[in-house]
Amino acid sequence: MDAIKKKMQAMKLEKDNAMDRALLCEQQARDANLRAEKAEEEARSLQKKIQQIENDLDQTMEQLMQVNAKLDEKDKALQNAESEVAALNRRIQLLEEDLERSEERLATATAKLAEASQAADESERARKILESKGLADEERMDALENQLKEARFMAEEADKKYDEVARKLAMVEADLERAEERAESGESKIVELEEELRVVGNNLKSLEVSEEKANLREEEYKQQIKTLTTRLKEAEARAEFAERSVQKLQKEVDRLEDELVHEKEKYKFICDDLDMTFTELIGI
């Protein structure tokens, strides 16, 4: 009888121990489930952060592409401005050459006019000298008349030459006026071109400043991309670690659940054994 009591006490103690272990296993399973849920929540949070970082990276890359496109446009504008400046310089050079040729033609026409005027003056003086002498000699008069006719002929020729020179001079003066007008227009154009050059210079300086700013922004974007890439790698590493932790916790939960099932089966076996023992005692 004492042996039965001892056996019953031992079985009861083993039952209590089994219950304690079962409760402990259940608590450990609950704790493991909580840790697993927490790890899953952290993994979801990390996944959201990774998505946000990827979105930030996409936006930064898009901004960098826009900055590069604007920089290309500014380079094209700078090249166009340089081409315009070169064309304007060529036009100024052509205007200056045209003005020099007009001045040369004017100087030539003025010299020819002076020569014609001098010849006409000499003929007129000779005619007046011959008329003032009043020679009685007919032959001398004839000679003088012939000389006069010749002088008149020369004067007429000189007049014709003078008229021709005057006409050419008028043409030259007209050309000169047009040249002066072109020169004035050229000077105005030069002033306009100088103003355009000044504006272009300011634009070039502005473009250089914009290019420097764009380069600085590009460096900042590169640094941001580098930082975001580092953060992305770190987040991926944390996500992988969290995933491994979840898998490890899931294995621990499975193990504890298996152990709990085993303890429950063991507890059921002890209960069945106690029932059989009580039945035997009652039968005795």
Curated annotation (Swiss-Prot):
GO biological process terms, semicolon-separated: regulation of muscle contraction
Coiled-coil ranges (or none): 1-266
Gene Ontology terms for molecular function: protein homodimerization activity
SUPFAM superfamilies from the UniProt entry: Tropomyosin
Organism domain of life: Eukaryota
InterPro entries associated with the record: Tropomyosin
Tissue: Expressed in striated skeletal muscle (at protein level).
Keywords linked to the UniProt accession: Allergen, Coiled coil, Muscle protein, Repeat
Function according to Swiss-Prot or TrEMBL: Tropomyosin, in association with the troponin complex, plays a central role in the calcium dependent regulation of muscle contraction.
Family stated for the protein in its record: Belongs to the tropomyosin family.
Subunit structure: Homodimer.
Domain notes: The molecule is in a coiled coil structure that is formed by 2 polypeptide chains. The sequence exhibits a prominent seven-residues periodicity.
Name used for this protein in its record: Tropomyosin Per a 7.0102
UniProt organism field: Periplaneta americana
